[in-house]
């Protein structure tokens, strides 16, 4: 067993060896290294064929038309293109956007930018389990609402939003619906023929593909128009200029093809691991699972251990690669804004740890983790005067602390 054990699959996945093998074939002189936009010779034609094949593999995962797939540098760029691109194209119709407080920064920050440009954005509060109340969403919709952006699966707590129902509400009012599916594409079924979703952001590296490549699904019927954010050679039907990275695109296509083929197997494997981990730590008293446990992807377990500082716990678990808060914001010591939005107090939000596992995680690694967590939590609580007070039955919320 290799240490430290990797439990941060929601931040990124290792590239599947089958994917890496396909990618290497698109790099060197004796491989398929051409520019897909070079239409005058065989090197370009072969590269274009590989890109078209990958486009089909990605479309296949969504049950979409390959012409609806636009390649980008990742889900962050896809989110920016979808949100700013749609808002700017349709701004004559209205300047109101709806999103949720627990979205990824790649959605919240473009929305903040739109606010600076004169748009109005409504940030919905989720319920305590992380799920959005559809009545609240419906109440927030207005005549001038042009876009709703809601993520499919949350990166910190793994809860699954009811995208199908939200899509129905949006379509009935002719509002464009964007979904950030970075954490769900390849993990749970996504069918654009069944779901009324107009724009979907995807990333390769959350599904055992390479980093630096993603895609945006742009619906053709009814046709969705976007204002390009990247200008140049007019690649990707004008949506996103820039030479296509054949090796990365081939990697993404292969990763999504494998994800489709192994989806049930991967799902069952992750669920068994999560149940094993939760069973091993849930009797540690004052343990809270953050986010709904049923409406959730099995690859994620976000737990708060009361009276234990998250940073101290991470340091004590040096043989486990886990995260406190999400990777994109965990450089700061601020408590997770996602957990705060669920109504957790600062202490519980600070004491949260996200375990995320995947295709290459083993039962042996889970058992090792359980033993490490139990030792670390008990040791840190033994050092905590607050834990002693809690054990003595003192309600800490009623204690008046002296300010120095």
Curated annotation (Swiss-Prot):
Pfam family, one: Aminotran_5
InterPro entries: Aminotrans_V_dom, Aminotrans_V_PyrdxlP_BS, Cys_deSase_IscS, Cysteine_dSase, PyrdxlP-dep_Trfase, PyrdxlP-dep_Trfase_major, PyrdxlP-dep_Trfase_small
Listed GO CC annotations: L-cysteine desulfurase complex
UniProt modified residues of type N6-(pyridoxal phosphate)lysine: 206
Major enzyme class: transferase
Reactions listed under catalytic activity: (sulfur carrier)-H + L-cysteine = (sulfur carrier)-SH + L-alanine
Cofactor(s) needed: pyridoxal 5'-phosphate
Keyword Cytoplasm: yes
Binding site for pyridoxal 5'-phosphate: 75-76, 155, 183, 203-205, 243
Positions of [2Fe-2S] cluster binding: 328
EC number(s) per entry: 2.8.1.7
PROSITE patterns reported in the protein's UniProt record: AA_TRANSFER_CLASS_5
GO MF annotation, one: metal ion binding
Pathway(s) this gene product operates in, as recorded in its UniProt entry: Cofactor biosynthesis; iron-sulfur cluster biosynthesis
HAMAP family: Cys_desulf_IscS (MF_00331)
Stated role: Master enzyme that delivers sulfur to a number of partners involved in Fe-S cluster assembly, tRNA modification or cofactor biosynthesis. Catalyzes the removal of elemental sulfur atoms from cysteine to produce alanine. Functions as a sulfur delivery protein for Fe-S cluster synthesis onto IscU, an Fe-S scaffold assembly protein, as well as other S acceptor proteins.
Protein name: Cysteine desulfurase IscS
Organism of this sequence: Vibrio atlanticus (strain LGP32) (Vibrio splendidus (strain Mel32))
Protein encoded by which gene: iscS
